[in-house]
Amino acid sequence: MHSQLRERIRLMRARLDNARPVIEIPAEFQLFVTPAPVCDRLVTLAEISNRDHILEPSAGTGAILRAIRDTAPGAMCDAVEINSGLVRYLRENFNGVRVQCGDFMEWQPVQYYSRVIMNPPF
């Protein structure tokens, strides 16, 4: 058993050694990344389809956007993110998603959305 655990730890360390941070986030932004299984569940519960136009009002690192893209690659997505560094990351990594930089509470959408998906418990 110990050898299996050691091997798992070694593999995790190897993955982390090759990983690079997306961006350094100052504490005042309060970034809460939703785990991938939770994102998948959110998308399933929201019954996302390729016909939907979806808003993600606090996109962060794009965890929910990734789950949407995996489930319904034809869905149109708009995202709002207050951190300009994360906005750059989202624009570079989520082609086709319209990413707005700003505070969602002050943002004025110009259209209606068929679905809004955000970090729980919101």
For every predicted segment, state its role.
Residues M1-F122:
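Class I S-adenosyl-L-methionine-dependent methyltransferase catalytic core
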